[in-house]
Amino acid sequence: MKKYLSIAILSVLLSLTLFGQNDKTLLVIENQNVPVSEFLDIYTKNNKNVDYSKASIDEYLDLFINYKLKLMEIQRLRLDTQKNFINEFQKYRDQLAQSYLIDKNTVDKLLNEAYTRMQNDVRVSHILVKLSPYANPKDTLKAYNKALEIRKKLLNGTDFAKLAIEMSDDNSARDQNTADGRLIPGNGGDLGYFNVFNMLYEFETAAYNLNVGEISLPVRTPVGYHIIKLTEKHPAIYRFKIAHILLMYPPNATAQDKESIKAKSDSIYKEILNGADFAELANLHSDDKGSANKGGELPWLTPFRLVPSFVQPIYNHKPGDYIPPVETFYGLHIIKLIDKQSPPEFAAVKQELLTKLYKDPRYLLAQKKIADSLKQVYKIQYDKKLLVNIAKSINKDSLLKRSFNESQIPNLDNILVKIDDNSIYIKDFANYIKKNQSLFTNTDDIQIFVNKMFDNFLNDKILEIEKENLENKNPKFAA
C-alpha cells in the first residue's frame, strides 16, 4: 500500500507552530492533498483535554495516516463492503465517537482531582460492614447502624485494631496461616499506604478528605460501609528503588528464633555502617535469593500493597541512606535506599493518569452525565410495572447458581422501552441480566437488582443510539 503514498510531513508538526499553518498541505496521497486543517479538525475533536505537545501530535498523526490510507485503499479497490476493511473503519469511527459520548468537563475535573491527590500518599485503617449494592432498604439501614455503632465505640476510645479484629468483615484484619504453615499476622484494619487509583473511588475520596487521626462517618462503596481512619499523610513517593538484605524467620518462629535473627541483622548493619560492601553482604547473607546475587537490588517499587512497616522508613530517609533492620512477617530487612522520586509535573504524567482514568469505574461518571443529559433530549417511554413483573418472574436460585436463562421471563418479544423511534425489547434486557447475573449475591433484593440493572441498561442503549446518530446530529463528526 505504501507505494501509492507520498508523505510530506511538514516540520511544523514537530512544534506548536502547526496551529498557524492550517492552510498548508500535510500529506499527499495519490496526488490528493490533505491539508493541515483536516488533521487539526479531527485532532481537536479527540484531544480537547490534551496539550498540543509533540508527543501527543505524533501519536495521533499515526492514527490519522492509517485512517486516510485505509479510506483511500477502500475507495481505490472498491472494497466498501469487504469485511476486514469495514471493521478497520468501524474501529476508527468508534474511537472518534467516544469523544462525543463523555462529558469533557467531568473528565477534566476527575483528571485534575487525580493529579492533586497524586501529590500525597495516605495511610488508612478501616472496618468494613459488608453490604451488596443491591441490598434492600432494611438490610441497608441495619448495616449503616452497625457502622455507626462501630464509629461510636472508636470515638469513645476503643482500640481500632482490636475492634477491626472483632467486627470487620474484611478478613485481612485477622491472623491467617499460609499453606506452608507460616503465620501472616492480621493487619488490624491497617490497609497501608495508597495513592490515587489504588482504592475504590468513594473510599479514596473519603480518605483524602480526612485529617490525620480523624475517623469518618460510614462510607458506602460497592462492597459495603467503611469506617475509615486516616493515620498518616506524606508527600507522595512516585516510585523508589532499594536494595535489601532479608534475614527470614523460619515457619512458626519462636521468640528465641527471632532474637537470634535480630542479633545477626544488627551485626550486619554495623558492618555496613563501618564501610562493608552492601552488595557483597547481600550476596552472602540475604535469604531473598531472587535479589541476593544482584546485590540485594529490587525493581522500582511503589508504596501501594507493600507491608507498611517496610515502606514507612522510606518516607523519612534520603537516597544513599542505610535503614536499620525493619521487621515484616517475612523477617528482618536491612535496606539501602538507592533512589526516591516525587510525582512528575502534570504534563509528563497526564497521559498516564488519563489511561488509568479510562480504566477506572469513576470514568463512568463522565458517561453517565452525557446519558442523563440525553434523557432530556430523547423521548423515553417505559412502564415501571414491567420491571416489577420481570423481577417476580426471576428464580433467585438460578441467579445464585449463575444458571439464569431468559426463558424465565414471559413476553420476551414485547417492547420494554422506546427511545424516540427505537424499540428495545424485553429479550434484550433479559440477555443483559444473564450477562450480569454473577453480580447477584444471596442477600440481594431481586427487585433492586433488576431496577439497577435496568438503569445501566437504559444508559447503555441511549449511548448506543446517540453513537449511531452522530453523523446526522453532528456535522463535524460526519466531516
What are these language model-derived features?
Residues Q21-V34, L40-A479:
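Peptidyl-prolyl cis-trans isomerase
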Residues I7-T17:
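Bacterial N-terminal signal peptides
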Residues M1-Y4:
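Positively charged n-region of N-terminal signal peptides that target proteins for export
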